[in-house]
Amino acid sequence: MAAGGPGAGSAAPVSSTSSLPLAALNMRVRRRLSLFLNVRTQVAADWTALAEEMDFEYLEIRQLETQADPTGRLLDAWQGRPGASVGRLLELLTKLGRDDVLLELGPSIEEDCQKYILKQQQEEAEKPLQVAAVDSSVPRTAELAGITTLDDPLGHMPERFDAFICYCPSDIQFVQEMIRQLEQTNYRLKLCVSDRDVLPGTCVWSIASELIEKRCRRMVVVVSDDYLQSKECDFQTKFALSLSPGAHQKRLIPIKYKAMKKEFPSILRFITVCDYTNPCTKSWFWTRLAKALSLP
């Protein structure tokens, strides 16, 4: 049975941060929530009970049951709905008697909320001052408010990812294998794959910049002969490198998954490569990649 009484939820974030959007919670907190709620037991409310409290319908819950991380997918789907917030999530966990979750994750949730507020304040402070007449003539980038399948159309709760995948259409089969190995296993990583996650109809350059810089913690580059001919991949790679000069933040991870006739790109030679073609290290490939993407 869930531990604690009425005061057990005292470790939860204070009311000043509870109205924040669910996007304030980072991947570490979401994974720990999954560890608590993915387990189906008879003595504690699990993710299905939470989904019902969030007003998900029966068929929607059945669809979530097919996912490797149903709690994570539930949070992703819920954060785009009206009324979804950190405070509401805590209220539902309290209602379900999951005081153990509140006690264990309360400090981490509070930390995430404070970081989110600080980042919002910094972004607001860095905005250039403009004359009202001039500002009114500048087109607003509303297109970036709803660019992925689980985005909030108003831009209040943008979808976030562990990694952006830079690839050519001809390499899509390897990208699909990457999805199976990293998303549908115990790693439970969340990848941004353009053909799957990005909505059609907007500028590819603007979308790539937004996702790489603001939505994804890292970028995986699937290097192949076709990659070398892609202007889109070239732009994405150079943009990611510009955000982390010298690769000090380990932001970009190159992958070589098949033999190449052309020379490996010189711009990536100074970064450690994940080599899927080496039979001696192939058994360690997915573990190394998953750990690299899981770093804070």
Curated annotation (Swiss-Prot):
GO cellular component: cell surface; cytoplasm; cytosol; endosome membrane; extrinsic component of cytoplasmic side of plasma membrane; extrinsic component of plasma membrane; nucleus; plasma membrane
Residue span of region Intermediate domain: 110-155
Record annotation: effect of changing residue 178 to I: Found in hematological malignancies; uncertain significance; somatic mutation; no effect on NF-kappaB complex activation
Effect recorded for residue 288 to A: Slightly reduced activity, and reduced interaction with TIRAP. Strongly reduced interaction with TIRAP
Keywords: Antiviral defense, Cytoplasm, Disease variant, Immunity, Inflammatory response, Innate immunity, Nucleus, Phosphoprotein, Ubl conjugation
Leader peptide range in chain numbering: none
Involvement in disease: Immunodeficiency 68: An autosomal recessive primary immunodeficiency characterized by life-threatening, often recurrent, pyogenic bacterial infections, including invasive pneumococcal disease, beginning in infancy or early childhood.
CDD domains from the UniProt entry: Death_MyD88
BP terms from Gene Ontology: 3'-UTR-mediated mRNA stabilization; apoptotic process; cell surface receptor signaling pathway; cellular response to lipopolysaccharide; cellular response to mechanical stimulus; cellular response to oxidised low-density lipoprotein particle stimulus; defense response to bacterium; defense response to Gram-positive bacterium
A GO molecular-function annotation: signaling adaptor activity
Consequence of changing residue 209 to R: Found in hematological malignancies; uncertain significance; somatic mutation; constitutively activates NF-kappaB complex activation
Written domain comment of the UniProt record: The intermediate domain (ID) is required for the phosphorylation and activation of IRAK.
InterPro entries the record matches: DEATH-like_dom_sf (IPR011029), Death_dom (IPR000488), MyD88_Death (IPR034249), Myelin_different_resp_MyD88 (IPR017281), TIR_dom (IPR000157), Toll_tir_struct_dom_sf (IPR035897)
Protein name according to UniProt: Myeloid differentiation primary response protein MyD88
Assembly and oligomerization: Homodimer. Also forms heterodimers with TIRAP. Binds to TLR2, TLR5, IRAK1, IRAK2 and IRAK4 via their respective TIR domains. Interacts with IL18R1. Interacts with BMX, IL1RL1, IKBKE and IRF7. Interacts with LRRFIP1 and LRRFIP2; this interaction positively regulates Toll-like receptor (TLR) signaling in response to agonist. Interacts with FLII. LRRFIP1 and LRRFIP2 compete with FLII for MYD88-binding. Interacts with IRF1. Upon IL1B treatment, forms a complex with PELI1, IRAK1, IRAK4 and TRAF6; this complex recruits MAP3K7/TAK1, TAB1 and TAB2 to mediate NF-kappa-B activation. (Microbial infection) In case of infection, interacts with uropathogenic E.coli protein TcpC; suppressing Toll-like receptor (TLR)-mediated cytokine production.
Tissue specificity comment: Ubiquitous.
This protein's record includes keyword Cytoplasm: yes
Mutation effect (residue 207 to T): Found in hematological malignancies; uncertain significance; somatic mutation
UniProt organism field: Homo sapiens (Human)
PTM annotation, UniProt: Ubiquitinated; undergoes 'Lys-63'-linked polyubiquitination. OTUD4 specifically hydrolyzes 'Lys-63'-linked polyubiquitinated MYD88. Deubiquitinated by USP3 that cleaves 'Lys-63'-linked ubiquitin chains leading to inhibition of MYD88-induced NF-kappa-B signaling.
